[in-house]
Amino acid sequence: MPLFSTDKFQIEIERNWKNIYNISETVIPPDEREVAAMIDQIMEYNKKFVENKGYEPFLTSKYPDKKLAILTCMDTRLIELLPAALGIKNGDAKIIKNAGGTMVHPYGSVVRSLLVGILELGVEEVMVIGHTDCGVQGMDGKEMLELLEKRGIDKQHIDIVRHSGIDLENWLGGFESVESSVHETVKGLKE
């Protein structure tokens, strides 16, 4: 199977996510046809991309040429901007993205991804990069929980997670400044 083919099954799972988790209709945009049409357009584009071998200019090994991993924010403005600003190209680095470009837990996916990069893929340097106007800056965990409840997440489910020892307010909370967030993340990764 070509490197960049997609799986319709995964899309169907995502379309039915609200039914699996009993989330109210407010989570899904009002016009599901628009969403379905957008997904169909993406999948059709991908089909043609694979058929035309559009992926060939991007082929590289799984090992980063610059032996570099970058932890950064998932902000849409960084998709092309960050590599351009750093002078890196496809194949140069492992880029790990999440909300805020932070490490929330020492046993979370960020640390796991970095360990795989270091131990299996030859990463020797790790950069943590924040950015101005980050949506996570100033985020309030309590307000996020209220938004979840407004979106139909049952308070009982939230309480179950709380009683299992997860500090949801902290987990969903943001940071006060980008600079301090980067410093705290670097400090946490070094520990």
Q: Model regions: which residues?
A:
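Ordered, amphipathic secondary-structure segments that act as subunit-interaction surfaces
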Residues: 119-131
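Divalent-metal-activated hydrolytic enzyme cores
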Residues: 9, 13-66, 101-106, 119-121, ...
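Short glycine-rich anion-binding loops that position phosphate/pyrophosphate groups of nucleotides
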Residues: 75-76, 132-134
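Conserved beta-strand-loop surface patch within small alpha/beta domains used
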Residues: 52, 56-111
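Short secondary-structure capping micro-motifs at structural edges
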Residues: 111-118
